[in-house]
């Protein structure tokens, strides 16, 4: 999040891991780099706790950042987005001394954040300084998964409350229609096991979700995940995958615009 990245090790890691990254091939200017096996393996314990794998994680983080920046460029006529990334090195005060997930996220740009600060006042606006307290579009890696999502962190109560207030003012059907355009995604409430599958949602199922969702207490996410276990990882290493991630994140932009506080979605303090 908004923390210094710290020391970057020059180590190359454990050469015994199968599928070590080959020498990079020359790619067209502006092309997104495909993922490599080390992007995932450097996040698996015990490597996730080792600074010897900082270089691998830094390379993976930069690939994710390029995906998020491509999304921001593509979406700039619809919404202005600012890109941030997670840290890639084990740093106990931030990640408990292990890096098991890397992400890049696109969230409201400085001008939009300034408007929100004016709306909520200086005291509450202090919470906006950490980017994750704003809703965001996310590209993420774990040892066994690749993910794109729209997420409102449990501490991002401004946007969570705005979302809930909008559904109360307009009813759930507009959101239902947006979610059911997102075949392949699922709606997620914190770490609950409920199945809210986009493309198959009914108004009753969405009512069930919002019966339990509490801004400030629960994570809200609309996410799509691809398995990346070593035995089946070849699919996520294909050169077209980063562009696919940009495409899938672009599909989330309408839900982002619906939920996030803005001039066009101003429900935060509605009665």
Regions found by a protein language model. Name each.
Residues 68-117:
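Glycine-rich, compositionally biased intrinsically disordered regions
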Residues 2-6, 10-82, 192-271:
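Long, solvent-exposed, polar/charged low-complexity segments
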């Amino acid at each position: 999040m908004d923390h210094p990245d710290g020391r970057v090790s020059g180590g190359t890691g454990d050469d015994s891991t199968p599928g070590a990254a080959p020498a990079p091939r020359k790619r067209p200017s502006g092309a997104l780099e495909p993922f490599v096996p080390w992007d995932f393996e450097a996040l698996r314990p015990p490597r996730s706790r080792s600074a010897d794998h900082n270089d691998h994680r830094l390379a993976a983080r930069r690939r994710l950042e390029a995906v998020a920046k491509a999304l921001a460029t593509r979406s700039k006529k619809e919404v202005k987005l600012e890109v941030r990334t997670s840290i890639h090195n084990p740093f106990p005060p931030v990640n408990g001394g292990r890096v098991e997930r890397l992400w890049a996220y696109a969230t409201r740009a400085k001008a939009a954040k300034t408007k929100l600060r004016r709306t909520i006042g200086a005291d509450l606006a202090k919470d906006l300084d950490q980017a994750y307290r704003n809703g965001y579009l996310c590209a993420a890696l774990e040892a066994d998964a690749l993910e794109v999502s729209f997420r409102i962190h449990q501490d991002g109560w401004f946007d969570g409350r705005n979302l809930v207030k909008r559904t109360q003012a307009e009813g759930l059907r507009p959101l239902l229609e947006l979610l059911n355009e997102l075949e392949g995604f699922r709606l997620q409430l914190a770490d609950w096991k409920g199945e809210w599958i986009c493309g198959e949602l009914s108004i009753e199922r969405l009512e069930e979700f919002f019966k339990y969702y509490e801004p400030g207490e629960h994570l809200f996410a609309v996410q799509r995940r691809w398995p990346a276990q070593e035995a089946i990882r070849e699919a996520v290493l294909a050169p077209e995958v980063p562009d696919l991630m940009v495409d899938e994140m672009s599909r989330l932009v309408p839900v982002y615009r619906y939920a996030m506080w803005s001039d066009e979605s101003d429900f935060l303090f509605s009665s």
